[in-house]
Amino acid sequence: MSLFPSLPLLLLSMVAASYSETVTCEDAQKTCPAVIACSSPGINGFPGKDGRDGTKGEKGEPGQGLRGLQGPPGKLGPPGNPGPSGSPGAKGQKGDPGASPDCDSSLANPERKTLQTEINRIKKWVTFSLGKQVGKKLFLTNGETMTFDKVKALCAQFQASVATPMNQAENRALQSLVKEEAFLGITDEETEGQFVDLTGRRLTYTNWNKGEPNNADSREDCVVLLRSGGWNDVPCSSSHLVICEFPV
């Protein structure tokens, strides 16, 4: 039996089968030819171009960024108020005894002698120009006149007292300084007619002028030395020469 008559028949069967598959694909897809639609997926193409920017969105809530670096130190502020005092510290230990001042005293003696010599020289100069020295008293005047209370205050300022003669020699020394009436440290302010010195002691020496004291107008409670050397009672509010008495 020959094979060639069967070949056309075989080809016809294959075409019929192929056609049958094509019709079935159209019924399922109903689009492009069955050969393209029913073939295997192709290879992916190149990416397309970027699309246009969309519309601008609404502003978002503020966010918190990363913590920055520490900044430089600021300027110094004003000083604060002083704080309260602290508690007292513990008592320290007793210190060692100090060095003996023997050497210092030996050096001070010559200096002390020099100073005393200078003081004596000044005393002599002052006595010669403005005062008189009698025994252990030095009488000095500044040549001013003032009331009795001011005379007392001025003499006290120099650790002295108002001149008070206790004997004839002292009275003569004061008389040599007087070119006008000078206050003496004698009053009867406490008891009228009873004259005492400024310490309250009764007088053991007096040299009243004739007819004195007379307490004229009942207000003469102080005493002045006249140029003649005699004494006279006067009002304490009157102004007379200042003479102070210094111990020597």
UniProtKB/Swiss-Prot annotation:
Residue ranges of coiled coil: 112-130
Composition-biased stretches (Basic and acidic residues): 49-61
Disulfide partners: C155-C244, C222-C236
InterPro entries the UniProt entry points to: C-type_lectin-like, C-type_lectin-like/link_sf, C-type_lectin_CS, Ca-dependent_lectin, Collagen, Collectin_CTLD, CTDL_fold
Gene3D superfamilies: Mannose-Binding Protein A, subunit A
Main location, first listed in the record: secreted
Gene Ontology biological process terms, A to Z: complement activation, classical pathway; complement activation, lectin pathway
Keywords carried by this UniProt record: Calcium, Coiled coil, Collagen, Complement activation lectin pathway, Complement pathway, Disulfide bond, Hydroxylation, Immunity, Innate immunity, Lectin, Mannose-binding, Repeat, Secreted, Signal
Tagged with keyword Repeat: yes
Signal peptide positions (record): 1-20
Domain C-type lectin: 134-245
A molecular function (GO) term: D-mannose binding
PTM description: Hydroxylation on proline residues within the sequence motif, GXPG, is most likely to be 4-hydroxy as this fits the requirement for 4-hydroxylation in vertebrates.
Region (Disordered): 43-112
Subunit text: Oligomeric complex of 3 or more homotrimers. Interacts with MASP1 and MASP2. Interacts with MEP1A and MEP1B and may inhibit their catalytic activity.
Domain notes: The coiled-coil domain mediates trimerization.
Protein task: Calcium-dependent lectin involved in innate immune defense. Binds mannose, fucose and N-acetylglucosamine on different microorganisms and activates the lectin complement pathway. Binds to late apoptotic cells, as well as to apoptotic blebs and to necrotic cells, but not to early apoptotic cells, facilitating their uptake by macrophages.
Protein name: Mannose-binding protein C
Organism in which the protein naturally occurs: Callithrix jacchus (White-tufted-ear marmoset)
Encoding gene (name): MBL2
